[in-house]
């Protein structure tokens, strides 16, 4: 079945995302970490490309997102920005780059923006980081919030289970979402929370709510690209829809290349100078 390709070549901005919510148009968002993949994702009509700290997992093989550094995030962000013409590029601020105090967070934010030429940043947390969020936004840097399951806090929670299932945590999430909007965030990611709660947040806020494992009654969806392309063979969470099985496709292609080299079938006469 043919996919969706936008004929609108205008650069996606924070204002356009808000307009999309207002007219009921869903926002598409995927991760990318390198130039080649970013070109493909942008060319396919993606609205937002997230240079996620999930690069720590899918690119570097770490168990959590915690080890990735500011320098490494800037490297990935630079590579992605070079490959993008239309999509908005949002960069995750890595663990340790903004949790200390607001001035350290601002310095990290300015460095990412100056060196990568990205369009916006994403931070995990609510009330506990609100002063940092305000400081970054006051410097003219657009900020996307992130609530619910927050992978940078995995050592606090101990598990990647669904968050905000009890009333107290759900009410805190709602309060935090309003605080982030009031602080000036242009959008919020809600990760792995009950669909009814995500729907409530999306209905109460005027800014876009992007879900990952947060149901279908939000303003957009985000996934890790390796997951939706089926490159991580053993990763099959309930919220994931796999649009390809690239693990099998790539393994087959590589094994055929190995076979051709071993059997002296590659290169042939037409593939030589």
UniProtKB/Swiss-Prot annotation:
Give the pathway listed in the UniProt entry for this protein: Cofactor biosynthesis; (R)-pantothenate biosynthesis; (R)-pantoate from 3-methyl-2-oxobutanoate: step 1/2
**Active site per database record:** 191
* GO cellular component assignments: cytoplasm
A biological process (GO) annotation for this entry?
Answer: pantothenate biosynthetic process
Cross-referenced Pfam families, in alphabetical order? Answer: Pantoate_transf
The protein's gene is named panB
Could you tell me what the cofactor note in this record states? Binds 1 Mg(2+) ion per subunit.
Q: Which reaction does it catalyse?
A: 3-methyl-2-oxobutanoate + (6R)-5,10-methylene-5,6,7,8-tetrahydrofolate + H2O = 2-dehydropantoate + (6S)-5,6,7,8-tetrahydrofolate
| Biological role stated in the UniProt entry | Catalyzes the reversible reaction in which hydroxymethyl group from 5,10-methylenetetrahydrofolate is transferred onto alpha-ketoisovalerate to form ketopantoate.
Question: What PANTHER family does the entry give?
Answer: 3-METHYL-2-OXOBUTANOATE HYDROXYMETHYLTRANSFERASE
Please list the residues that bind Mg(2+): 53, 92, 124
What's the source species for this entry?
Bacteroides thetaiotaomicron (strain ATCC 29148 / DSM 2079 / JCM 5827 / CCUG 10774 / NCTC 10582 / VPI-5482 / E50)
Q: Which family does it belong to?
A: Belongs to the PanB family.
Q: Which HAMAP family match?
A: PanB
The alphabetized UniProt keywords are:
Cytoplasm, Magnesium, Metal-binding, Pantothenate biosynthesis, Transferase
Matching entries from SUPFAM superfamilies are given as: Phosphoenolpyruvate/pyruvate domain
User: What cofactor requirement does the entry state?
Assistant: Mg(2+)
Where in the cell is the protein located?
Cytoplasm
Record's protein name: 3-methyl-2-oxobutanoate hydroxymethyltransferase
Keyword Secreted present in the record's keywords: the answer is no
Q: Identify the InterPro entries for this entry.
A: Pantoate_hydroxy_MeTrfase, Pyrv/PenolPyrv_kinase-like_dom, Pyrv_kinase-like_dom_sf
Task: Give the binding site residues for 3-methyl-2-oxobutanoate.
Answer: 53-54, 92, 122
Subunit structure of this chain's protein = Homodecamer; pentamer of dimers.
Q: Which GO terms describe its molecular function?
A: 3-methyl-2-oxobutanoate hydroxymethyltransferase activity; magnesium ion binding
Whether Magnesium counts among this entry's keywords is yes
């Amino acid at each position: 079945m043919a996919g969706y390709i936008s004929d609108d070549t205008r650069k996606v901005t924070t204002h356009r995302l808000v307009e999309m919510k207002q007219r009921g148009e869903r926002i598409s968002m995927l991760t990318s970490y390198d130039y080649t993949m970013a070109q493909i994702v942008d060319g396919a009509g993606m609205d937002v490309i997230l240079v996620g700290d999930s690069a720590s997992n899918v690119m570097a093989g770490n168990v959590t997102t915690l080890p990735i550094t500011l320098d490494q995030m800037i490297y990935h962000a630079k590579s992605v920005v070079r490959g993008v013409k239309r999509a908005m590029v949002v960069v995750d601020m890595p663990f340790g780059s903004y949790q200390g105090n607001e001035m350290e967070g601002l310095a990290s934010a300015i460095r990412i923006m100056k060196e990568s030429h990205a369009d916006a940043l994403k931070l995990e947390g609510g009330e506990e980081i609100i002063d940092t969020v305000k400081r970054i936004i006051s410097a003219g840097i657009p900020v996307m919030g992130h609530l619910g399951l927050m992978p940078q806090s995995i050592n606090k929670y101990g598990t990647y289970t669904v968050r905000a299932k009890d009333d107290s945590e759900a009410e805190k999430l709602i309060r935090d979402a309003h605080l982030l909007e009031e602080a000036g965030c242009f959008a919020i990611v809600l990760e792995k929370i009950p669909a009814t709660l995500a729907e409530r947040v999306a209905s109460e806020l005027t800014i876009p709510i992007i879900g990952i494992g947060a149901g279908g009654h939000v303003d957009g969806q985000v996934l890790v690209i390796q997951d939706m392309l089926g490159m991580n063979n053993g990763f099959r969470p309930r919220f994931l829809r796999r649009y390809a099985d690239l693990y099998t496709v790539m393994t087959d292609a590589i094994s055929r290349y190995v076979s051709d080299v071993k059997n002296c079938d590659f290169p042939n006469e037409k593939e030589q100078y």
